Design a protein with these regions (language model features):
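Membrane-interface extramembranous regions
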Residues: 2-163
């Protein structure tokens, strides 16, 4: 008869289940974000001309900026996927997002577009038609990425079992 006094869904049990769901959701989110950064980083090496054209003209080392940021995206994206290195990877990605933000501002201010000319050469086009709105929309999206990554800088238990 005593077993009837045990609540099958106690608050503690529900809290453990919810904690597990929340941790699993954050793990899945970090994995998706990490994979996105890894793929974007790889793309820096595949389409170097495109990414070098995005680098503001006042920064003289476009090739270095492209390869360094692409390499950082790969390494930090992988770190975000691995729970043991997630916080460090997230902090690194935050710094990277802040470092590349001036390129987004430059693209908006100067109406920059990256186009392929008739000879098949990728080039940076300043005062391009019809890009202002697109370049403006990129600016707040960077803050969304910062927020998504920032969520993984906080100390979290790595116990995904819910126990």
């Amino acid at each position: 008869m005593g077993f009837l006094l045990i609540k099958p869904w106690s608050r503690e049990m529900m809290a453990n289940i919810w904690s597990s769901v929340k941790l699993n959701r954050l793990h899945i989110e970090a994995t998706i974000i990490g994979i996105a950064f890894v793929l974007e980083g790889i793309y820096h090496f595949i389409d170097q001309d495109f990414f070098e054209a995005i680098v503001p003209t006042w920064f003289r080392y476009a090739t270095f900026a492209n390869l360094a940021s692409g390499g950082a995206e790969i390494v930090l994206g992988l770190m975000l996927i691995i729970p043991k290195f997630r916080r460090i990877g997230a902090w690194g990605l935050l710094l990277l997002l802040v470092a590349v933000y001036p390129a987004n501002i430059d693209m908006f201010i100067n109406d920059v577009d990256v186009q392929t000319n008739a000879l098949g050469v990728v080039e940076r086009v300043v005062d391009a038609e019809g890009v202002r709105l697109r370049n403006f929309i990129r600016l707040p999206f960077q803050f969304l990425f910062v927020w998504l990554v920032w969520r993984h800088t906080r100390k979290q238990p790595i116990n995904f079992s819910g126990s």
